[in-house]
Amino acid sequence: MEFTTDQILEEGITAHEAGQLHEAERLYRSILKSHPAHPEANHNLGVLAISINKVKSALPLFKTALEANSKNEQFWWSYIDALIQDQQIGKARQVLKQARKQGVDADSLNTLERQLSEKTQKPDPAKLSPPE
């Protein structure tokens, strides 16, 4: 019996939620073999990569998901958050501006903007000095 892409995606999500990461990855990749730009499979595989500290692997997956469906706010959030985690601050700011232009929820973007600010703040030298 042939399964539809949606059925395979649901199986992947179920495996992912159950912590069966290898099975989830296999299922997401099986979708991407026949539908390389599938937004949910790319996004979910990116989320999986982030969960095992493979941020660099997640970035192109999130970007592909976003290019395939720029209306999904979660795709914007995931991509910007991954850029911040990867210390790509300039790129994160650029994508954040694009998200605002697309009408992504301001509260969500404000949270990411705070994360960006925290990453770019210079440490206070007084706090770095050893106590006398």
Residue map of PLM features:
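Structural marker of alpha-solenoid helical repeat scaffolds
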Residues: S34, A68, Q85, K101-Q102
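Structural signature of tandem alpha-helical TPR/SEL1-like repeats
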Residues: E2-D6, E11-S30, S51-T64, D86-Q98, ...
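Short, charge-rich amphipathic alpha-helical segments embedded
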Residues: R29-S51
